[in-house]
Amino acid sequence: MDVIQPCIKIQVHTKYIEEQSNPELQRYVFAYVITIKNLSQQTVQLISRRWLITDSNGKQMTVEGEGVVGQQPFISGSDEYTYSSGTALETPVGVMQGHYILLDEKGNEFITEIDPFRLAIPNVLN
């Protein structure tokens, strides 16, 4: 499996979901919206994902599975795919990172890394 970074660009936006959170019970819920941009001219298919989620206490959780939000989307050349999902932490600050495994038009698998991104309630410095 090859790592081919330049052809895929990942953009992430996060938001704290206060109405689903309960700080007294150490439950902090975050939503994230991810846009996967295919910068190549060929169609790719996202077949699986792997996340490493770390809270500010150092507690880690790994999430792996097929596709994203129940789909294994095809992303045409110069097109993009956007989806939203969420996670809950026991602390008000955390970090997510991971990778997607994709297929090119020839059926070759490749990995696209997802750089670490911060999950934090507003106005937290940690």
UniProtKB/Swiss-Prot annotation:
Gene3D superfamilies: ApaG domain
A GO BP entry: error-free translesion synthesis
Domain of life, source organism: Bacteria
InterPro entries in UniProt: ApaG_domain, ApaG_sf, Uncharacterised_ApaG
Boundaries of every ApaG domain copy: 2-126
One Pfam family this sequence matches: DUF525
PANTHER family tied to this protein: F-BOX ONLY PROTEIN 3, POLYMERASE DELTA-INTERACTING PROTEIN 2
HAMAP family in the record: ApaG
Protein name: Protein ApaG
Naturally occurring in which organism (per UniProt): Vibrio campbellii (strain ATCC BAA-1116)
Name of the coding gene: apaG
